[in-house]
């Protein structure tokens, strides 16, 4: 082991791999739960709106897929002999998609809950809810793009 390739370098990559899936799953779970509560509350009086109002739950689930993609990519590039640079890049990629997915899940949950409740009373609010949900979903997509760019730079010319 050299100073560029210490024995603990893969630990940072493993933490990046775990944080990608953990934080995006937390965001997706919050978004699903918060939107689901709004759907259940509105479908008591308007059961015909169930399938129309399921959009926030689907969009919250997509956030977890972003974390899964990055987690699998980081996991496949983990190695026993790895540069510290690579471990830090993998950690950054995992945190990038994970924390942006957490924020996107929170936004989707809050907007989905309020939007579903509002659109059951005023159907014209549905289009506005969808537009706001798209902007919230893009927050997670930004983190995915940054994570993929970081992961593509993880294998530099450092030889262990």
Swiss-Prot record:
Cited Pfam families: ATP-synt_C (PF00137)
Recorded GO MF terms: proton transmembrane transporter activity; proton-transporting ATPase activity, rotational mechanism
Transmembrane segments: 9-31, 54-74, 91-112, 125-150
UniProt-annotated site: Essential for proton translocation, residues: 137
Entry-linked Gene3D superfamilies: lithium bound rotor ring of v- atpase
Keyword Ion transport attributed: yes
GO cellular component: fungal-type vacuole membrane; Golgi membrane; membrane; proton-transporting V-type ATPase complex; vacuolar proton-transporting V-type ATPase complex; vacuolar proton-transporting V-type ATPase, V0 domain
Keywords: Hydrogen ion transport, Ion transport, Membrane, Transmembrane, Transmembrane helix, Transport, Vacuole
Keyword Transport included in the entry's annotation: yes
Subcellular location as annotated: Vacuole membrane
Segments on the Cytoplasmic side according to the record's topology features: 32-53, 113-124
GO biological process, one term: vacuole organization
Residue ranges that the UniProt entry lists as topological domain Vacuolar: 1-8, 75-90, 151-160
Membrane topology: Multi-pass membrane protein
Family label: Belongs to the V-ATPase proteolipid subunit family.
Role noted for this protein: Proton-conducting pore forming subunit of the V0 complex of vacuolar(H+)-ATPase (V-ATPase), a multisubunit enzyme composed of a peripheral complex (V1) that hydrolyzes ATP and a membrane integral complex (V0) that translocates protons. V-ATPase is responsible for acidifying and maintaining the pH of intracellular compartments.
Subunit structure: V-ATPase is a heteromultimeric enzyme composed of a peripheral catalytic V1 complex (components A to H) attached to an integral membrane V0 proton pore complex (components: a, c, c', c'', d, e, f and VOA1). The decameric c-ring forms the proton-conducting pore, and is composed of eight proteolipid subunits c, one subunit c' and one subunit c''.
Other notes: Present with 8450 molecules/cell in log phase SD medium.
Stored PANTHER family: V-TYPE PROTON ATPASE PROTEOLIPID SUBUNIT
Full protein name: V-type proton ATPase subunit c
Protein source organism: Saccharomyces cerevisiae (strain ATCC 204508 / S288c) (Baker's yeast)
Gene: VMA3
